[in-house]
Amino acid sequence: MARGILSPRMTLLHRKRGSPICKTRSDDAMGNWTRRRFLKAAGAAGMVAASAGVTGSYTLWRTVRGELPPEGSPYVENWGEATADLREAPILLVWNDRGTPPTGAYLAEILRAEGLNAFRTISLEALREELLERFPLVLLSAGSLDTTSAEVLRRYVARGGSLIAMRPPPHLADLFGVEPLSAQTVDGYIRILYEHPVGRGFPPESLQFHGTADHYRLAGAEEIARLATKAGDLPFPAVTVHRSGLGKAALWVFDLAWSVALTRQGNPALAALEGRKPVEMRAHRLFRGWIDLDRIEIPQADEQMRLLSRLIAWMLADRLPLPRLWYFPAGAPGMLVATGDAHNTPPDAVEEALRRVEQRSGWFSVYYAPLPRNPAQRAWHRLRNWLERSAAHVVQPEHVQAWRERGHEFGIHPYVEEGLEAGWRRYWEVFTGMGYGPVPPTVRTHRVLWSGWVETARVQAKYGIRMNLDYYLIGPLFRKPDGEWAFGYFTGSGLPMRFVDEQGRLLAIYQQPTHLVDEQLIGWTWEGAPRFPPAKAVEISRALIERAAKGAWGAIGLQAHIDPFAIGGEAAAAQAAWLEGVLDAAVAYGLPIWSAQRWLQFVEARMGAVFQAVRWNPTARQLRFRVIPAAPLAFQWEIGMPLEFQSLRLTRVEADGQPISYRERPLRGISYGWIALPIRS
């Protein structure tokens, strides 16, 4: 194998199977300083300035002025190039620019999120028969097809290829073994059928989809999922597979990629409506009437993505056992992404949260909003700290450096009431002017204010932010008509994926939902909040963590404000009890407790990984492949291979020529052998 390349080899031996600002004493710039102390400080400041003048370097003044955010393209440029190398891979993704919008880029994002990084990409215009013959399976994004392209796909299937098409045009209906009907369903449900092998292991409840689904009548196809209402099934298929010639053709009656985007990112129509009152727009309000609160405990978008990955593996089962990457590091069943907003809180309050997280071997993200001081005020606070090192009223650069050295993230928490870009520029300048830079790559906006459908994400990506945690479960819209409060996956997901805009363009920033929010559970900031006792709030949080660990497989976002620890008293006691209960639940169920920044590093390495040279040798009964991560990391990931393939069973795995043990764990109807390996090239 190539030097330094990770090369797992699977040998299959033949055997028949049977938030408000926290006001502290620091808000008064002078505090209880005496006139004498002030004059002493002023004199010291003069000496500092004079010294700086001698050396020609006004270091303090220059640093307190702060920086403006760098600007770049917010988009994932040339997203298909990383997978355009058409060397051996089992899956070819054909993106169709005729979709409304084109969703090929987001369909590729789904494959990566599912760990099926063994794919290559081409545009529909580049479709050629000789190219298709290299791939046992073709995945086609939604959009119209001309006659020539349609005939190329027909011949590919007839000669033994497998095709999965997202909402193809009706003139291909016979290829998929269905007959088109005139009606459609908009924003409905599907039910995955346990009776079909592909449907085994999925939730029995009907699942929401968003977008338009075409109605068909079965005409020889096998039904994998059915259109439904909340109350019961409709007489129309949602997902089918049909044996045609020597191959197979599977149909999705709606655009799965766009449905997942809509489910995760909310209703674009509400974004347009709320845009008339931008100050009142908040990310969670995009989900008013959009999510079925009776289904919120199920990650509905994730389950439908898993249905696609299960279908792909099933359709390839006569060609090769398909490897994949597990969702989380070192085989963990989920993650707790631990974060907390802080509003000018003192360092000892920050330590209260960090200490509790560190006691459980975790890391934490603090999103900090300093007061919007001007340069002179920032210089005063920096100087005051220099004069009085014991002062603990304001977070200083030394605190930030020490926290980061301990593995925590100390990031920006911008106020954007004055306008999205104006707020970002101002808070970037203040944050760096206080000596807190560099600005880390993850963020949560104050009050989770949101612009447009994805405008906030677009601006953040432009400034180099790579993960957003603004999608935040809070408010009365999560209360059912009977008064019960709903908690769970309000975006339909527990997985990070990049945002996509209205034109189908992929943004260079991940959406990580925040599922567990102190404001919603112990209710200390907004009128009408549930205000559960800490024990009840822990019980609710623990139930979500348990579901994540036992089959929902999600990265649970946590918001635990720092402010209550600065307020003290009952607020601090309740916050401490709830936070400790959540952290203990994560430990009990095996969820690592990571900061958002650390989690982002893993996500980018995993999502950017590529399986290369995937080859099945039927004579030797061996599967060989290489895995190239986007970047080496000091973490582990898990690579899974089916335990059974045709009449064979996995008996031995080697990595870089050395035997390695594996553990067995099922994933939606398939039993896998999983090996944990360092993320390296």
Where in this protein do the model-derived segments appear?
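Catalytic grooves of carbohydrate-active enzymes
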Residues: D294-I298, L320-P323, G340, V500-R598
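A glycine-centered loop/beta-turn motif at secondary-structure junctions
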Residues: L86-P90, G104-E109, A113-E114, S162, ...
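Surface-exposed beta-strand/loop patches in extracellular or lumenal glycoproteins
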Residues: A630-S647
